[in-house]
UniProtKB/Swiss-Prot annotation:
It comes from Sulfurimonas denitrificans (strain ATCC 33889 / DSM 1251) (Thiomicrospira denitrificans (strain ATCC 33889 / DSM 1251)). It holds the Pfam family EFG_III. Its main location: cytoplasm. Residues 8-286 form the tr-type G domain. GO terms for biological process: ribosome disassembly. Belongs to the TRAFAC class translation factor GTPase superfamily. Classic translation factor GTPase family. EF-G/EF-2 subfamily. GTP binds at residues 17-24, 81-85, 135-138. One of its GO terms (molecular function) is GTPase activity. HAMAP family: EF_G_EF_2_B. The gene is fusA. This is Elongation factor G. Keywords: Cytoplasm, Elongation factor, GTP-binding, Nucleotide-binding, Protein biosynthesis. Catalyzes the GTP-dependent ribosomal translocation step during translation elongation. During this step, the ribosome changes from the pre-translocational (PRE) to the post-translocational (POST) state as the newly formed A-site-bound peptidyl-tRNA and P-site-bound deacylated tRNA move to the P and E sites, respectively. Catalyzes the coordinated movement of the two tRNA molecules, the mRNA and conformational changes in the ribosome. SUPFAM superfamilies: EF-G C-terminal domain-like, P-loop containing nucleoside triphosphate hydrolases, Ribosomal protein S5 domain 2-like, Translation proteins. InterPro entries: EF-G-like_DII, EFG_II, EFG_III, EFG_III/V, EFG_IV, EFG_V, EFG_V-like, G_TR_CS.
Amino acid sequence: MARSHKLEDVRNIGIAAHIDAGKTTTTERILFYTGREHKIGEVHDGAATMDWMEQEQERGITITSAATTCEWAGKQINIIDTPGHVDFTIEVERSMRVLDGAVSVFCAVGGVQPQSETVWRQRNRYGVPSIVFVNKMDRTGANFYAVEEQIRTRLKGNPVPIQIPIGEEDNFLGVIDLVKMKAIVWDVDAAMGSNYHVEEIPANLLQKAQEYREKMIESISEVDGNEHLAEKYLEGEELSEDEIIAGIKAATIGMHIVPMTAGTSFKNKGVQTLLDAVVAYLPAPTECAPIKGTMMDDEDEEVIVPSTDSGEFASLAFKIMTDPFVGTLTFIRVYRGSLEAGSFVHNSTKDKKERIGRIVKMHAVKREDIKEIYAGEIGAVVGLKYTTTGDTLCSEADKVILERMTFPEPVISVAVEPKTKADQEKMGLALAKLAAEDPSFKVHTDEETGQTIISGMGELHLEILVDRMKREFKVEAEVGAPQVSYRETIRDTVNQEYKYAKQSGGRGAFGHVYLTIKPGDAGTGFVFHNEIKGGVIPKEYIPAVEKGCAETMSNGVLAGYPMEDIDITLYDGSYHEVDSNEMAFKLAASMGFKEGCRKARPAILEPLMKVEVEVPEDYMGDVIGDLNRRRGQVTNMGDRSGNKIVDAFVPLAEMFGYSTDLRSATQGRATYSMEFDHYEEVPKNVSEEIIKKRNG
């Protein structure tokens, strides 16, 4: 079966936004206009196609990025819907990894929200070109130009309107296309916004349209590679429509500008013009920088994997989902070559052979079986045994490992227990499946209490996973109080000698090490240096020393929390010809490391959350007072659409139950968002409390 669309006619895009910007509605409309959807699904009544899990429909927020395929103007558009809630940034992160372009949806009233900043940062990290869609232009308080200003000041982006709105709020009629210099006005009819007509620009907006067209042309002519446009522009020559379109595309793909469009998905205006922009300005796989990787057998050998149909198969698994009917679905993005159903591939990340059962293309929840999937396409594979998120699947003939994704460590834990003994085994299986789908969700058993502990990125994240356990796996669970994931570190540098010697008839044990233990840079975790000269400790025992230190890192000296950011150098020691062995050196290192840490002024670290509260001015004092009581540090205060914005760093330990407290303190008029930011040392009095509680 040949390709349905040429590689250069494929667009892989994500639709990203904060909660309530109207992202799911926008995706629904796109599916409707591209002919995939017969009846428009509304989030308001919980029937949107992309929100395919029951809880998403109930909560009206999108949790998992469902992938779907549609067609517009002869181009194939693969859409990945990404969640807007901050507890699910991991989902956004993994979808950004496999996209070539993105549509950032902003609410014309709410503008740039804290979640938008997180998504924008991820977009920049992965170099994903974007188009902005300013949605909800029909709402009271809508202001297209305020959103443009916020993108510039708060996100440090370079927004360039390629359309401007005709009217706003109740009078929003359509947009002016600044490339063609025509007005596009939607009919007020029953055909769900399918009918619009092109007319001349209204006289009262002509001057504004000319001014914004000037700005647009100026922005694109400043970009490297568009010098010919700059020359024509400076000499006062008219640029042709094709030249402007090519200029906008080059500037967008080069991450120099972000074209802005406007509309209201709910009222079916502006979605077709957004699709036109996606097809015209976002890159095909062939127009993106090729993905880098390393060879499986030699991690130092960097290779470049271009997007092409020829060459050996290479793809990245970016999402795992459990489907009630077909079992495990592994979503992959193919970068090179093609893949046939029934064939064998190599998982180079795990060095395992996998058999491809079926290949399906998803349309939100409906699926279509296909025989083959090609470069640049996104699809789901059934029947993989070993593959998890972030693994590379490739051909046996060219074992390449594509760039790995980085996943954040969980910051919050709760104990879960099945309501009945009979559910114990079912719960174990359910949690294992959920953990396979979501790398930011961890499950372990507490050795002391025997309880099952689940950890994730926030209260909502864990709530939803417990809820899914109940719905999808029919396991009822009791959930304990949330626990904070503390860490431990040291503040001083120490040199520590430790000799482990055991003589007991027959063979003894002997290991002797000198370690320098010092605080590492933030975020480095555990770093080990071997500076043994002249074989005072034989080479084969060095890994045992490293292992002894690394394993001890998981159990700190103050309260048994994992340690981080510690730098260890092994610089001297001695051994015994007969009695030395790996175990002895491992124990010497472990005990020496522990003893050294006790002398190095150990400290407890806690996760600090970046919190943003939007609050009416009357309640501002109460909110700030409350944040201070929670050991918060207020970092900034500002205004947004008539409300006050308070930014602060607050310890996670103080944020449990905050939503209820904030609601009652402000009569439900304030909203907040929070995300993990960094670890910081806890004050002495808090540290003493934590140690007392942990050590009973």
